[in-house]
Each structure stands twice: as structure tokens, then as C-alpha cells.
């Protein structure tokens, strides 16, 4: 049947068409069914929605996302026919029943996700199947190969190309913004691509976006990397491993990150960016994505083995995931703290981790036998900050930006300690929730500043954290979460005292 396109003032991040009830019945369609939409020699697969109020017979409604993605306008006349359920759904059902994927099956699933053939519900089933049943290393390797095959790739004709990545989940984990320019200052090429926030209040791309443009194409990434030594860009616009961003979007809704998917996400992006040497950060902690050292070692060994099979040299580092890295959580707050570190105004664990990860790459590539010391020498010479400013300028930012120039939310609230002792535990999930409720990462100036970290002494009335927001109502909501979640556990050296049959806390 032929239909005239009608654009609707809606935006959903999926490919869909809206048909009238009569037209849907004529085609034998129900909500959620698929159709093939053809016009001008092109075609795409879309989900069906049905509306009797907004769409007349003979019209096919599309939201702005579908119109932009598929180059549709109201002048378009399209042909719509039912589209059969893809074979990839059968393969997902097979995994749910406990079977192992074949190479061609995982390739078909990833292809279907990349081309928007699978619905969000079916992608959810894929995620749940791999979370519940798990995946063997060869299945993960096939998934990575399929993700890279259908996407863009950066190809460098010269130089040693390296990269770094964290599996995420840790608030404030912005070591890349310091480590990347340190590595680039040593003469290595580092085309760093990263995701936006998934479970935290800011991803690497969100923080870098405060200072520079992160929406770069593959050609721009190559050009800037060859010009100044590195970039820090958002992965999605590059077209590298396009299935990854689509899987991540659904994982976020499910609040799930299956470990096989973490491995595939990281290594597919690194392969697509042209890297040959990769350093992987694996935060370990009770509320982190990897809960203990034993699980972390297994995760690290699997990543190194899969990397080796993909001709990718991978080194891993198990790092402290029990508390935030640095003290700032949220895009602008983190950007300001990164600049404060590079301007030599503050030190601490953010700097130490940044130099440690950079040092791993220096040792992998033979630049130094003691990578950490080499990284520190570069940092203390001022070359890290100098190179960072070059990267910011190359990505369209202000190369003279200073920490005090970074604007943060003007609505604030400080939570104070009600008792004395020392910080015994910090709930990173609670801090993430407080910062996100305050508006991060969408509101760049929103987030949390942590005044006290583990092991630090606390007196009654001492500030524990300050919430920043751009909107008063979001600040109020974040305060409510902060008062409910109890992100800090404070105790004395004596946790409880027992005397004559009674307990005292």
C-alpha cells in the first residue's frame, strides 16, 4: 500500500511509523509488528504504532528521529508492506534456553540491531539472555567482530596507535582527560572514543563536552589525532560499532550491564578506532560493576585472551571502585577538577590513576621501563596541560580555558555530618543517584562534590557533600534522595560496645 508521510512533533529514539487503525487492519498489522518502508529505491524496517486520532487513512506518521534518520519529508510517498519476524529472534530464544550461539547467529543478531530490525523488547531479550546464561569467550569474540564489521573504522598509515578505556560505573572516573594528553605528549597516537553516561552522572564524553565539541566523524578523529596526537570524542556519531550504542541505550533502561557486553563494548570500540595497544581500567568494589578481586581477575584474563585472538594487545588494571575517583561528580564539576589537577592546584587519586594508566601504555609500547615515572615526568613538565589545550582547541574549544572559567550549577545544598568518627564506607550508587536526580548529565552544571572520602576524620557539622543543580526543583529532589540514601557510613574505631548484657552503638 502507498502512504504519504506525515511528520509528527514527537521524538523517540527508534525507527517507527504510525498508521491509522483502518490501514493497519487492512495490512493485518498489530502494534509492535514490523513493516518494510520503501521509497526512491531505498528501504528500511520500522515498528508499527497505531493511532486513530492523529493519522488519517493513507498517511504514515513518523517522529523527528525517524524522519531525520531515514531522510523523510512530507513530500515523500512510500510503500509499506508487512515484514516477517527476523531469524535473529529465534537465535535469542535459543540462548534463553541455554544454548551456545554459532558465529553466524551472533553476526545476524548484531546486524539486525545495527539496522534497526530488532525492537527494544527483542534487544532486551538479547541482553537478558546473555546476562542469565552468559557467553563463552569465543561467542564474545564473534560479537566483537560482528560489531566492528558493520561499522566505520579509523585507519592510520603511520605511528603507534594506543587507547584506554574503563568499564565504567564509578563516579568521577575521568582519568582519560589527563591520561590521553599525557600519552599524546609522548608521541603516541591515541584516538580516544567514549560513551556518554550509562549508570553514572557523567561519562567521559559528557565531561569533555563541557570544554570542546565531542561529535566528531571518523575522518575528523583521524585528522585531529594525526595533527595533535589524540582526541577525546563521543563514540556514537563516529559510526564505530553502531550496535554498541543501541544495546547500551536499552541496557540503561534495564539497569543491566552484562559482563560479556562490557567486554564487547570496550574492545569493539578500540578495534574500530585503529588501536593496537589498549589499557583497560576495571574498578572493583561492592557497588561497582565488578564486585570483588576474584571476579575482576577472571574478567581481566578473559579480556586479554579475547584481545589476543583479535590481534589486540590488552593490559588490564584492577582499581579501587569503592569510592569516587577524585571528589567531583557531574560534567562541569569533573571538568573543573580535571583542569585543577593539570594546573597543579590539587593532587590525589585522580592524578595517580591517570599517571598509572598512561604508564601502562608506555610500558606496553616500550617507551619506558617504569611507565608511571615517565608519565609523572611528562605531567610535571607541564606537557600534559599543554597537550590537553591543543586537543581542546583542535576540537573547537577554548585552548586558554582555566578551572575557574568552568561554570557549575548555582543552586546548592550542603549535607553536614550528624556525628563524629571517620568515613567507613561510601555508597557510590547513592552518589550517582543524587547527582543524576540533581540533573546530571543533561544539566552540565549539576552534580555532587564530595568533601570527605574513606578514612578521613569527620566532626559534627563537617560538610560531607555539596549538591549542585541548575533548577531549584531538581535540587529539592536531590536533597530528598541524599537524606534518604545515606551515602556515607560514619563510625568510630570502636563500632559497638558491650557491657553487662547491653549493646551500645
UniProtKB/Swiss-Prot annotation:
Q: Give the matching NCBIfam families.
A: AMP_phos (TIGR03327), ARCH_P_rylase (TIGR02645), PRK04350.1 (NF003338)
Q: What organism does this protein naturally occur in?
A: Archaeoglobus fulgidus (strain ATCC 49558 / DSM 4304 / JCM 9628 / NBRC 100126 / VC-16)
Instruction: Please give the Gene Ontology molecular function terms for this protein.
Output: 1,4-alpha-oligoglucan phosphorylase activity; AMP binding; pentosyltransferase activity
Give the superkingdom in one word.
Archaea
Q: Which SUPFAM superfamilies match?
A: Nucleoside phosphorylase/phosphoribosyltransferase catalytic domain, Nucleoside phosphorylase/phosphoribosyltransferase N-terminal domain, Pyrimidine nucleoside phosphorylase C-terminal domain
Give the SMART domains listed for this entry. PYNP_C
Purpose of the protein = Catalyzes the conversion of AMP and phosphate to adenine and ribose 1,5-bisphosphate (R15P). Exhibits phosphorylase activity toward CMP and UMP in addition to AMP. Functions in an archaeal AMP degradation pathway, together with R15P isomerase and RubisCO.
State where AMP binds.
169, 195-200, 204, 265, 289
Alphabetical list of Pfam families matching this protein: Glycos_trans_3N, Glycos_transf_3, PYNP_C
The text of the family note is: Belongs to the thymidine/pyrimidine-nucleoside phosphorylase family. Type 2 subfamily.
What's the protein called, per UniProt? AMP phosphorylase 2
Q: Which UniProt keywords apply?
A: Glycosyltransferase, Transferase
Amino acid at each position: 500500500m502507498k502512504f504519504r508521510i506525515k511528520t509528527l512533533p514527537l521524538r523517540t529514539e527508534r525507527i517507527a511509523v504510525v498508521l491509522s487503525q483502518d490501514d493497519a487492519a487492512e495490512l493485518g498489522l498489530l502494534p509492535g509488528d514490523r513493516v518494510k518502508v520503501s521509497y526512491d529505491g531505498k528501504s528500511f524496517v520500522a515498528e508499527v504504532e497505531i493511532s486513530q486520532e492523529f493519522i488519517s487513512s493513507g498517511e504514515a506518521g513518523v517522529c523527528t528521529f525517524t524522519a531525520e534518520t531515514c531522510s523523510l519529508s512530507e513530500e515523500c510517498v512510500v510503500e509499506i508492506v508487512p515484514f516477517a519476524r527476523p531469524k535473529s529472534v529465534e537465535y535469542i530464544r535459543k540462548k534463553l534456553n541455554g544454548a551456545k550461539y554459532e558465529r553466524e547467529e551472533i553476526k545476524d543478531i548484531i546486524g539486525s540491531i545495527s539496522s534497526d530490525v530488532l525492537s527494544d523488547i527483542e534487544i532486551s531479550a538479547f541482553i537478558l539472555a546473555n546476562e542469565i546464561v552468559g557467553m563463552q569467550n569465543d561467542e564474545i569474540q564473534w560479537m566483537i567482530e560482528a560489531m566492528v564489521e558493520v561499522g566505520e573504522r579509523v585507519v592510520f598509515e603511520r605511528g603507534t596507535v594506543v587507547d584506554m578505556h574503563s568499564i565504567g560505573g564509578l563516579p568521577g572516573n575521568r582519568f582519560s582527560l589527563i591520561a590521553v594528553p599525557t600519552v599524546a605528549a609522548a608521541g603516541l597516537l591515541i584516538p580516544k572514543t567514549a560513551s556518554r553516561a550509562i549508570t553514572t552522572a557523567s561519562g567521559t564524553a559528557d565531561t569533555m563536552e563541557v570544554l570542546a565539541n565531542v561529535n566528531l566523524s571518523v575522518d575528523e578523529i583521524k585528522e585531529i589525532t594525526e595533527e595533535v596526537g589524540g582526541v577525546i570524542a563521543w563514540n556514537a556519531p563516529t559510526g564505530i560499532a553502531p550496535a554498541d550504542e543501541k544495546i547500551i541505550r536499552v541496557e540503561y533502561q534495564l539497569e543491566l550491564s552484562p559482563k560479556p557486553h562490557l567486554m564487547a563494548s570496550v574492545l569493539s570500540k578500540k578495534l574500530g578506532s585503529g588501536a593496537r595497544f589498549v589499557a583497560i581500567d576495571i574498578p572493583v568494589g561492592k557497588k561497582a560493576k565488578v564486585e570483588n578481586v576474584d571476579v575482576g581477575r577472571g574478567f581481566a584474563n578473559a579480556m586479554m585472551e579475547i584481545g589476543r585472538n583479535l590481534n589486540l594487545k590488552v593490559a588490564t588494571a584492577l582499581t579501587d571502585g569503592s569510592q569516587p575517583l577524585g571528589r567531583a561528580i557531574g560534567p562541569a564539576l569533573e571538568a573543573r577538577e580535571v583542569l585543577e589537577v593539570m594546573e597543579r592546584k590539587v593532587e590525589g587519586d585522580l592524578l595517580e590513576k591517570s599517571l598509572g594508566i598512561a604508564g601502562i601504555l608506555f610500558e606496553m609500547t616500550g617507551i619506558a621501563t617504569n611507565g608511571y615515572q615517565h608519565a609523572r615526568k611528562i605531567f610535571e613538565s607541564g606537557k600534559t596541560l599543554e597537550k590537553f589545550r591543543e586537543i581542546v582547541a583542535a576540537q573547537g574549544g577554548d585552548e586558554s580555558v582555566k578551572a575557574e572559567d568552568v561554570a557549575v550549577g548555582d543552586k546548592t545544598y550542603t549535607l553536614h555530618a550528624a556525628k563524629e568518627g571517620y568515613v567507613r564506607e561510601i555508597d557510590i550508587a547513592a552518589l550517582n543517584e543524587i547527582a543524576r536526580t540533581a540533573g546530571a548529565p543533561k544539566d552540565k552544571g549539576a552534580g555532587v562534590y564530595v568533601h570527605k572520602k574513606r578514612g578521613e576524620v569527620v566532626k559534627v557539622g563537617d560538610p560531607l557533600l555539596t549538591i549542585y543543580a541548575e533548577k531549584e526543583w531538581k535540587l529539592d529532589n536531590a536533597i530528598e534522595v541524599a537524606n534518604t540514601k545515606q551515602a556515607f557510613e560514619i563510625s568510630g574505631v570502636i563500632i559497638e560496645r558491650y557491657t553487662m548484657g547491653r549493646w551500645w552503638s
